[in-house]
């Protein structure tokens, strides 16, 4: 009996010691550790087992700061949309390890910049790409989006109506009006006016989802917002274009809607159906789709830059850069602060996501529509917008990814003034 008591006492002591070690590395568990490690002195074997240490699951102490900032635990169901896979991933880290699309997305700004330099330096590199190639190229980009979607993902929109509505209104109301005001304020030449306004009326850019990921924003919201704005662009973009620039240049809204239907809705729907009913096909094509999307983006950017090189490098072309830069900076700022209004007051990740989705639009679609319906010179603003949008958007996302906010930008450049105010 004494041996049993001694063994039980030894086992209890070792168990308590183990619990003490497990909780020592976690400061938030000190009170529980003291409670478990210091039971009252037992008088019998039954009393020794009176307060058996509770086994704590290892996941209780697991923390993932990098995942928590992005909001993966709350949006685990849509996390796989970051990749070109056919189904959900077990963890974001494993998705990043086996998914080439994220690495290619990180290289996209460099590819865009290299495309611009090549098109302006040696126009023959892209001048062979005629407007007949634009629709297939953009269709390849849209197909790469469609295979990332599933029918269940759109059900999330009904569960999150407020942030989705804010982002959608900023995309199709605030941004087009802002584009018209900026174009008129800078006295934009008529050769670029209609194309610039059209660029402000298209759907969100696919790159905004990656920018939301870098900025530790709401990735699921970004993908839903981009998908909804892309699908509805079949109707909304022709209507906005006719209202805002119909008095400047003639716009065939019905023909534009048919073109968007062919190059946007059909490829996206095809990809959605493949991902839903033919996952084996998606598993075959998904490794090459990131490369296809990047190649198509490069063609859609380089062609209008190469064809209109003389106009871009002219005095009028240089005057075009300032309005485009102003527009994108204003769109990022307005998209952020409109989400901070007292009656809308959204969380920081949502504000960042709406900001990048407002400041980044599908300029490749605008370039296609401008080339088909407005003339090749009107595609120049869209091509320039792609370059500026990618550089500014991913720079801002990287800044936010370091844990900083827009309101902290001033203190980064004027640290002494910030220190004086804080003291």
From Swiss-Prot:
It is found in: Membrane; Plastid, Chloroplast envelope. Pfam families: SBF. Coiled coil: none annotated. It is a multi-pass membrane protein. InterPro entries: BilAc:Na_symport/Acr3, Bilac:Na_transpt, Na+/solute_symporter_sf. Its main location: membrane. The keyword Acyltransferase does not apply. The chain crosses the membrane at residues 106-126, 138-158, 165-187, 192-214, 231-251, 254-274, 287-307, 318-338, 380-400. GO terms for cellular component: chloroplast envelope; membrane. Residues 1-45 form a transit peptide. It comes from the Eukaryota. Keywords: Chloroplast, Membrane, Plastid, Transit peptide, Transmembrane, Transmembrane helix, Transport. Belongs to the bile acid:sodium symporter (BASS) (TC 2.A.28) family. May function as sodium-coupled metabolite transporter across the chloroplast envelope. This is Probable sodium/metabolite cotransporter BASS3, chloroplastic. It comes from Oryza sativa subsp. japonica. The gene is BASS3.
């Amino acid at each position: 009996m004494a041996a049993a008591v001694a063994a039980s006492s030894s086992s209890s002591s070792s168990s308590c010691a183990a619990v003490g070690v497990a909780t020592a590395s976690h400061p938030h568990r000190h009170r529980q550790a003291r409670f478990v490690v210091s039971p009252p002195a037992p008088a019998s074997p039954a009393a020794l087992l009176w307060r058996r240490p509770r086994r704590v699951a290892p996941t209780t102490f697991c923390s993932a700061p990098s995942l928590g900032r992005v909001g993966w635990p709350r949006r685990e169901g849509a996390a796989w949309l970051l990749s070109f896979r056919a189904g959900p991933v077990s963890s974001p880290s494993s998705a990043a390890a086996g998914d080439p699309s994220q690495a290619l997305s990180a290289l996209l700004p460099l590819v865009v910049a290299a495309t611009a330099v090549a098109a302006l330096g040696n126009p023959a590199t892209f001048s062979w790409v005629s407007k007949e190639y634009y629709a297939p190229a953009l269709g390849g980009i849209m197909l790469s989006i469609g295979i990332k979607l599933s029918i269940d993902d759109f059900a999330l929109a009904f569960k999150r109506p407020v942030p989705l509505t804010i982002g959608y209104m900023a995309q199709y109301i605030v941004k087009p009006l802002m584009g018209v005001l900026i174009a008129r304020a800078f006295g934009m030449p008529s050769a670029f006016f209609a194309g610039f306004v059209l660029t402000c009326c298209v759907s969100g850019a696919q790159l905004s989802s990656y920018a939301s990921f870098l900025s530790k924003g709401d990735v699921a919201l970004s993908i839903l917002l981009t998908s909804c704005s892309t699908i509805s662009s079949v109707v909304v973009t022709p209507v906005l274009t006719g209202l805002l620039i119909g008095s400047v240049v003639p716009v065939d809204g019905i023909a534009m809607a048919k073109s968007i239907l062919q190059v946007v809705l059909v490829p996206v729907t095809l990809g959605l159906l493949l991902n839903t009913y033919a996952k084996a096909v998606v598993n075959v094509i998904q490794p090459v789709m990131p490369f296809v999307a990047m190649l198509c983006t490069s063609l859609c950017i380089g062609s209008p830059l190469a064809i209109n090189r003389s106009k871009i490098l002219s005095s009028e072309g240089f005057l075009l850069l300032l309005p485009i830069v102003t527009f994108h900076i204003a769109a990022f700022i307005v998209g952020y602060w409109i989400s901070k209004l007292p009656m809308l007051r959204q969380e920081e990740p949502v504000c960042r996501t709406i900001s990048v989705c407002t400041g980044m639009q599908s300029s490749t679609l605008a370039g296609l529509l401008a080339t088909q319906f407005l003339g090749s010179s009107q595609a120049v603003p869209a091509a320039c917008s792609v370059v500026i949008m990618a550089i500014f958007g991913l720079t801002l996302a990287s800044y936010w990814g370091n844990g900083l906010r827009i309101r902290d930008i001033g203190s980064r450049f004027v640290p002494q003034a910030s220190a004086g105010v804080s003291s």
